[in-house]
Amino acid sequence: MALMAVNTRCLCLFLLCTITGHSLEIKVNPPQDFEILDPGLLGYLYLQWKPPVVMDNFKECKLEYELKYRNVDSDSWKTIITRNLIYKDGFDLNKGIEGKIRTHLSEHCTNGSEVQSPWTEASYGIADEGSLGTKIQDMKCIYYNWQYLVCSWKPGKTVHSDTNYTMFFWYEGLDHALQCADYLQDNEKNVGCKLSNLDSSDYKDFFIRVNGSSKLEPIRSSYMVFQLQNIVKPLPPEFLHISVENSIDIRMKWSTPGGPIPPSCYTYEIVVREDDISWESATDKNDMKLKRRANESEDLCFFVRCKINIYCADDGIWSEWSEEECWEGYTGPDSKIVFIVPVCLFFIFLLLLLCLIVEKEDPEPTLSLHVDLNKEMYAYEETLC
C-alpha cells in the first residue's frame, strides 16, 4: 500500500510538471509600437500597432488582438477583438484617453487552451492652453427639424473684452475639419453658429471644437461629440381636430409637421383638458381616442407636441406645444335655442326701427285739421249771405 501511494504521488508530480512545462513553453509577445494618434479631426483618433515578435513555431497561427480604450474619467472600457492593425473611433478631447492591447493566440495553435500576451498601454491628451475660465460656457446644439444645426455658447467667465471664438466641425465624409461660415453674434462677438446642408451626416459622430483668440492671454478650447439624429427638435404638430362620438368617446387628430422627418419617426405627447381637469397621454400615431371623464363637461380641449421616437434615434428634444384646439359642442336643440333667441331679438328690434321710420314719413295731424276747419268756416259764411 505504501509503494502504491508513492507511485501515485510520483505520477501526479510528473503530470503537473509536464503540464506546467508545456504552459511555460507557449508564450506570445504583446503588439509592438502601440500608440494613439490624432489626425486633426477634432476627436476622431487612430489607435494603431504593429504585430508582435512571434516565435518560429507560431508563425502560421492567426493572431487576434484584444483592444480596450476609454476616456480617463469613465468607469467602463470599450472592448474590441480584431485582426487588423488599426482601429478608429471618436473621443471627447476635453478629457484624456487611455488604451491597452494584448495578443491572443488562436486555440488550434495552443491545443485548445487560451494564451494571451501581457498588456501594453498608451495614452493621449490635449495640452491645456489657457485657464479654465477662458473656456466657453453653456454650449448647446439643436438640430432643428432635421434640417439645420444651431450651436450656441456663452463667453468664458474670465476672458478679456477682445476675446472672440471660432467653431470648427467634422464628420466622416469630409476631407478635413471645416470652420463655421454663418456665425450668430452679440455685440460683434461670435456666440453661436448655424450649419445647413449637412449632407450624409446622420447616424455618424459629429465633432465640434470651439477655440478662441485674445491678444492678452491664450484661450482654452472646448470639444463636443454627438450624433445629429439624437438632438433633433421637430416643429409642433399642425391642423388639430377634436370631436366627441356617442357622447363619451373623444376623438383627436393632427397632422405631422412639414419637413424631411418621416411620419413613422414621431412620438407624441397629448394633454387633454376637460373643464378644470387635465391629463396626459402618449402615442406613436397621429390620432387618439379617449373616454370623457365627465359627460356634462362644457370645456373640452387638447394640445400636442412631438419628438423623434426610439426607432429613429436614441434621444431627441420635444417640439414646442401646438396651439390648443377645443370641441365646439353639440348642435342639438339646446344649441339651436341659444342661436335662435338672439336672432329673433335682432329682427324684433329691426321691425320696431322700421315702424318708427314709416311713422315719421306720414302727414302731421295738425295740418289736416287746419284744412278741415277752413272748409267748415267757408261753408258757414256762404249760408249767412
From Swiss-Prot:
The chain crosses the membrane at residues 337-357. Keywords: Cell membrane, Disulfide bond, Glycoprotein, Membrane, Receptor, Repeat, Signal, Transmembrane, Transmembrane helix. It holds the Pfam family IL6Ra-bind. Cleaved by MMP8 leading to a soluble form that is also able to interact with IL13. Disulfide bonds join C61-C109, C141-C151, C180-C193, C265-C312. Residues 358-385 are cytoplasmic. It is found in: Cell membrane. Residues 24-336 are extracellular. Glycans are attached at N111, N164, N211, N295. This is Interleukin-13 receptor subunit alpha-2. It is a single-pass type I membrane protein. It comes from the Eukaryota. The WSXWS motif appears to be necessary for proper protein folding and thereby efficient intracellular transport and cell-surface receptor binding. The cytoplasmic domain functions as an inhibitor of IL-4 or IL-13-dependent activation of the Jak-Stat pathway. The lineage of its organism: Eukaryota, Metazoa, Chordata, Craniata, Vertebrata. Cell surface receptor that plays a role in the regulation of IL-13-mediated responses. Functions as a decoy receptor that inhibits IL-13- and IL-4-mediated signal transduction via the JAK-STAT pathway and thereby modulates immune responses and inflammation. Serves as a functional signaling receptor for IL-13 in an alternative pathway involving AP-1 ultimately leading to the production of TGFB1. Belongs to the type I cytokine receptor family. Type 5 subfamily. GO terms for cellular component: external side of plasma membrane; plasma membrane; receptor complex. Residues 30-130, 133-221, 236-334 form the Fibronectin type-III domain.
